[in-house]
C-alpha cells in the first residue's frame, strides 16, 4: 500500500508542477505562443480523475460508494484553484523581473533546446546553467527557491516567446527541472498557498 501512495504522490507532484508551469504561461500577456499553449493544454493530464457520473453496480447488487473519491475530487478542484492562483501570483512577480533577463541568454538557451540530439539531462543542465547566471546577477530580496522558481518560469516564457515551436520542449524541461530541484518548495506552496 505504501508503494501506491508514493507512486501516486510522485504523479500528483508532476501534475501540480504541470499545472503551475501551464498556469504561469497562461497568465503571461505575451500571445506569441498562445496557439501552442492551447494545444499543450489538451495533452496535459488532469490533477485528479473525474468521477462524475461514475456509479458502478457491484456483484451484490448495490451501487458502489465513491464518497472518498468525491472528496478527493473536491479537494483536487480546490487544489487546482490554489495552484492557478499561485501561478498568477508568480506571473505578477515575474513581470517585475522580466526585464532583467538578457536576450542573449534566452537566445542561447533557445538554440540549445532546439538541438534535438541533446538528452533531457543535457537540457536540464542548460536550464540550470542559465538560472545560475541569472541568480548571480539578481538581488537577494526574495528567498532563493522562490527566485529560482520565478526565473525558471520566466526563462520558459522567454524561450517560448522567442521560438513558439519550442514551447513543448521548454515546458517539459522546466517541469523536469522544477521536479528535480524545487519539488519540496512547490509542495509547500501547494499546501500553504502563496504566503
UniProtKB/Swiss-Prot annotation:
N-acetylmethionine modified-residue sites: 1
Modified residues (Phosphotyrosine): 54
Cell compartments where the protein resides: Cytoplasm; Mitochondrion membrane; Mitochondrion outer membrane
InterPro entries: Bcl-2-like_sf, Bcl2_BH3_motif_CS, BID
GO MF annotation terms: cysteine-type endopeptidase regulator activity involved in apoptotic process; death receptor binding; ubiquitin protein ligase binding
Subunit comment: Forms heterodimers either with the pro-apoptotic protein BAX or the anti-apoptotic protein BCL2. Interacts with PLEKHN1.
Protein name: BH3-interacting domain death agonist
Amino acid at each position: 500500500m505504501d508503494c501506491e501512495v508514493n507512486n501516486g504522490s510522485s504523479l500528483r507532484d508532476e501534475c501540480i508542477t504541470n499545472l503551475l508551469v501551464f498556469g504561469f504561461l497562461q497568465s503571461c500577456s505575451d500571445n506569441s505562443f498562445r496557439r501552442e499553449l492551447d494545444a499543450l493544454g489538451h495533452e496535459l493530464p488532469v490533477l485528479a480523475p473525474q468521477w462524475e457520473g461514475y456509479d458502478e453496480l457491484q456483484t451484490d447488487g448495490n451501487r458502489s460508494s465513491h464518497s472518498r473519491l468525491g472528496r478527493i475530487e473536491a479537494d483536487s478542484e480546490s487544489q487546482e484553484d490554489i495552484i492557478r492562483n499561485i501561478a498568477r501570483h508568480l506571473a505578477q512577480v515575474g513581470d517585475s523581473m522580466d526585464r532583467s533577463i538578457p536576450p542573449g541568454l534566452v537566445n542561447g538557451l533557445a538554440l540549445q533546446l532546439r538541438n534535438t540530439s541533446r538528452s533531457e539531462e543535457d537540457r536540464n543542465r542548460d536550464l540550470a546553467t542559465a538560472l545560475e547566471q541569472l541568480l548571480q546577477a539578481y538581488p537577494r530580496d526574495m528567498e532563493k527557491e522562490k527566485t529560482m522558481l520565478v526565473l525558471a518560469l520566466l526563462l520558459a516564457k522567454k524561450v517560448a516567446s522567442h521560438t513558439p515551436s519550442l514551447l513543448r520542449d521548454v515546458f517539459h524541461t522546466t517541469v523536469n527541472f522544477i521536479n528535480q530541484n524545487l519539488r519540496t518548495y512547490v509542495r509547500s506552496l501547494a499546501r500553504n498557498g502563496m504566503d
